[in-house]
Amino acid sequence: PIDIYNHGKMKRDFTYIDDLINCIYELSKIIPENKNNLLKVSNDDSLSSSAPWRVVNIGNNNPVNLMNFITEIEKCLGKKAIKNFMDIQKGDVPNTWSENKLLRELIGFAPETKVSSGIKNFVNWYQSYYSHKNEKE
């Protein structure tokens, strides 16, 4: 069984791995504009273009209902999950999402792979990988 917290009343902003890799690759090409200013930037200013580092959210900016996510996995697998509905965990939040405005400004795009496509791709990869692995054993 899978534990489903807050009785499934949650939303999450899922990001497909290929999108994540592409964004990180593009971000790695961005070099601070003025190397002479690196020492003048305060350590807490991660948004400065001359900081030696920067925090950038990478995500679809499109929260998905957890139950829809599970239904999509069930559809791809052709199986119904055994669900164990539970109360929300202490400290958890019902909804999360990624603000990707800075990401779009920096690299000109943000992740856009639909959750249904990402799940389908992942399930296909997983089944293929583990069927080949099991054949070798």
Predicted regions and their residues:
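C-terminal substrate-binding subdomain of Rossmann-fold SDR/epimerase-dehydratase oxidoreductases
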Residues: 1-137
